[in-house]
Amino acid sequence: MTEKKSHRGLLVISRHAESEWNLLGKWTGLTDVNLTEKGAHESTMLGELLRDIDFDGAYTSDLKRTKQTLAGIIKGKLADVTVDDKSIKHHPALNERDYGDLTGKNKWEVKDEIGEEAFNGIRRGWDYPVPGGETLKAVHGRVVPYFETEILPRLQAGESILLVAHGNSIRALMKHLEGIDECDMAEVEMPFGTLLMYYFEPDSSLPRTKQTRKIDITPPHA
């Protein structure tokens, strides 16, 4: 998928680009919406930032917006690989948080209805309940085991892996990788247009170093 491999594994994480419901300010969750035209363009810009890296494989969630972002990244990289290539895996463990009864509702209208404290609890809290949906803690409970089983062994073997997921599934993984305390999770963000790069040694289950790369975009309603 051209920094060549060294003894260190590399995990590059990207949030999907702007989706149709991001543009509208709606809680999307498991609703399978497409990228906007702007999002598709920005995904190719992300790919341009990764032309120096030779990936051994890629992972996305089961949802179209991550698959379409990966397709754009591949296009931007000018890589000789297709989105149905055997090196690419899609899995629901990486899906966005299920927002339950809030799915499809405008975030800012809900904020006006319930107040800022409850809104921030729902949006950024660690174990804040959402009627019919998931907490971030529950997302962590599915993302981390999948990472440890499917992705970590490849990183420890020195492979370079690209992961395209969602704001909350990435935040959950960041908690694990960076040892972030539960009480600090409200401050953890995964911005659009940002690439997180974690480097792994063969004997380590957690990254030793972290870098970031960014494209210059106008962020949508996260």
Give the positions of each predicted feature.
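Short polar catalytic/cofactor-binding loops
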Residues: R15-E20
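Beta-strand elements within well-structured catalytic alpha/beta cores of enzymes
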Residues: L10-S14, Y59, K89, E159-A165, ...
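GST superfamily/GST-like fold recognition
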Residues: G167-R171
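Short catalytic helix/loop segments, enriched in acidic residues and glycine
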Residues: G29-M45
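Phosphate-coordination/substrate-recognition cap region in phosphate-metabolizing enzymes
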Residues: E3-S6, T44-F119, K175-Y199
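Non-catalytic terminal regions with compositionally biased, polar/charged low complexity
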Residues: T2-G9, Y59, I215-A222
